[in-house]
UniProtKB/Swiss-Prot annotation:
Coiled coil: none
Protein name: Pyrophosphatase PpaX
Organism (species): Bacillus cereus (strain AH187)
Function: Hydrolyzes pyrophosphate formed during P-Ser-HPr dephosphorylation by HPrK/P. Might play a role in controlling the intracellular pyrophosphate pool.
Keyword Hydrolase appears in the UniProt entry: yes
Family: Belongs to the HAD-like hydrolase superfamily. PpaX family.
UniProt gene name: ppaX
Length: 216
């Protein structure tokens, strides 16, 4: 079956929001729990939803913590977000070649739109599924299924690209092929353990992979 659809995670995959996310967690947690959290303590919080993360920290303050996190994240967004090399050119080329492209993210829509506008990727994506659009987040298949439905695509014709195990397992649960990105903050070996179909060292690696898949 040929691949005609590529779904992307956003944070840590299409745009480098690592410092923004880490700073947002540290600001929020050190406001409420001074001197209890260091940088390495918040790395495991990258990937799950904010609700899941903050529920484990303090069930009674979840909404308060989310509000504090999002406010800092919003206020410091443009100064802390960076581009990844070859991302823009690769997505541009995929569109040129006629691929359907979508985003499946666990972020809220407002900050998703800020990131896409800042990176100028907003012109390429017709379908963006955020946490505001679904009941279940990755690795549950619902967000991917919703994106595929909106793109009128079948799972077996799609590839999910991401930097976290939620993306890889989410793709596997939805029945798509999967590609992990080696620039994940959690390290290449961490993602290899989830057995993605492909590992990308840079986003442009996608182009020959898709070309080979569609030739066979």
């Amino acid at each position: 079956m040929k691949i005609n659809t590529v779904l992307f995670d956003l944070d840590g995959t299409l745009i480098n929001t690592n410092e923004l996310i880490i700073s947002s967690f540290l600001h929020t947690l050190n406001t409420y729990y001074p001197d209890q959290y260091k940088r390495e303590d918040v790395l495991p919080f990258i990937g799950p939803s904010l609700h899941d993360t903050f529920s484990k920290i303090d069930e009674s303050k979840v909404e308060e913590l989310i509000t504090s996190y999002r406010q800092f994240n919003h206020d410091h967004h443009d100064e802390l977000v960076e581009e990844y090399e070859t991302v823009y050119e690769t997505v541009q080329e995929l569109k040129k070649q006629g691929y359907k492209v979508g985003i499946v993210t666990t972020k809220a829509r407002q900050t998703v739109e800020m990131g896409l506008k800042l990176s100028k990727l907003d012109e390429f994506f017709d379908v963006v599924v955020t946490i505001d659009d679904v009941e279940h987040v990755k690795p549950h298949p619902e967000p991917l299924q919703k994106a595929l439905q909106l793109l009128d695509a079948k799972p077996e014709e799609a590839l999910m690209v991401g930097d976290n195990h939620h993306d890889i397992v989410g793709g596997q649960n939805a029945g798509t092929k999967t590609a992990a990105v080696s620039w994940t903050l959690k390290g290449r070996a961490y993602l290899e353990a989830y057995k993605p179909d492909f590992m990308l060292d840079k986003m442009s690696d996608l182009l020959p992979i898709l070309s080979d898949m569609n030739r066979s």
